[in-house]
Structure formats: C-alpha cells, structure tokens
C-alpha cells in the first residue's frame, strides 16, 4: 500500500501537518476549497522561478493568512518589500478577501522533494539527458543531508517512440514505515515529444515520540545464564 498511496497524505496527523488549516461548515466548505486552489495555482504560476516548496493557507473568522516557503525569497520580496504589496493586492482581487502574506526561506532546498522534481523538469525542458538530470538532483539531496532519495521519470524519454519509466534509488526510502519522515514532490516537463512526469521521494529520518522506546523482543534480549545452586557447608 505504501508504494501506491501519496506518502504525504498517508502520514497526515502522524509526522506531517495539513497545508490548509481551517475549520469549515457545510455552507462555506466548497467555497474555501475553491479559494485555496485558486491561491496555490496563481502563486505557483507567478512565482515559479522563486522555487516554491510549500504554500500554507490558514483562516480565521475574518482573515486569511498565506505562508510561502521559497528557496529564493528575494525574488518574491523585491526592493524594500514592494513586490509583496503588489502580490497581496493581486490575491485580494482574486478572492475578494483581506489577505496577509508571510515569506519564509527554504534553508535546505536540496532536501525538498518538490524543488527537486521541478529541477529535473526544468533540465529536461532544456534538452539535458534525463539520467544526468536525475543524478544531479540525487547528489544535491545527499549533500543536504537526506538519508535516501528515489527519483522516477516517465514518458517518451530521449524522444523514444515508446514511453517507459526509469528510476534511481540512493540510500533507503521506507514507504511502508509510518514514522519515517518522507517528502514527496511531482512535476511535469513539457518537451517537444510530449509531457514527462517526474516523481521524487526523499527520506529525512524517522520520527519517534518523546519518551517512547522501541520494545525489546525476546530474541533481541541477551540470554541470561542460569544461576548455580549454592552448596551448603
């Protein structure tokens, strides 16, 4: 099951938090979902070259707060924050509500699965060999401290007549382990031969609750030697 399902959705509430944080009612649930989709689509298209790894949407009774995590926040902020004000006005015109925008820097861009997938897509669109692009992303993730990475590309690779799927795996990526912190990203490369899909899984380590120790089984515990009976004097 872990090989098929989205690893982020499988771990929500375990070691991953929701990217849309609000409590809906039946009356406004569809409206809020539509607004979140518009916000994410708009920001992804407008700020693509800023390297966006995550977009968080939080709602209160009257306000809406959007947090953008980007590898190059300077492109979004601009000189003295002028570009942020323009972006805020565009979002307010898009959804018709007051919006607050926070910009955060992605400190370990190499360990972000979404940025890695977009990097491979950009290289494929520039006609770089897919194997070279995949290995470059894997090396960047390893330098950033990732414990494992898997990259999969699918489509007409190298302009071949028949579509196929190829993947590389370095380290370990335990998709079945729920306590494993795994980041997942997907992107598409639009080439002259058609679209190529890129999927990236990055394993960042296991997360255990504080104070919880793994149970010791009888096999793992060292065997105790039987005590010798004492002889009476």
Curated annotation (Swiss-Prot):
Keywords: Ribonucleoprotein, Ribosomal protein, RNA-binding, rRNA-binding. Binds the lower part of the 30S subunit head. Binds mRNA in the 70S ribosome, positioning it for translation. Transmembrane segments: none annotated. The gene is rpsC. Residues 39-107 form the KH type-2 domain. Gene3D superfamilies: 3.30.300.20, Ribosomal protein S3, C-terminal domain. It comes from Campylobacter lari (strain RM2100 / D67 / ATCC BAA-1060). GO terms for biological process: translation. Residues 213-222 have a biased composition (Basic and acidic residues). Signal peptide: none annotated. The keyword RNA-binding applies. Residues 211-233 are annotated as: Disordered. The lineage of its organism: Bacteria, Pseudomonadati, Campylobacterota, Epsilonproteobacteria, Campylobacterales. It comes from the Bacteria. PROSITE patterns: KH_TYPE_2, RIBOSOMAL_S3. Residues 224-233 have a biased composition (Basic residues). It holds the Pfam family Ribosomal_S3_C. This is Small ribosomal subunit protein uS3. GO terms for cellular component: cytosolic small ribosomal subunit.
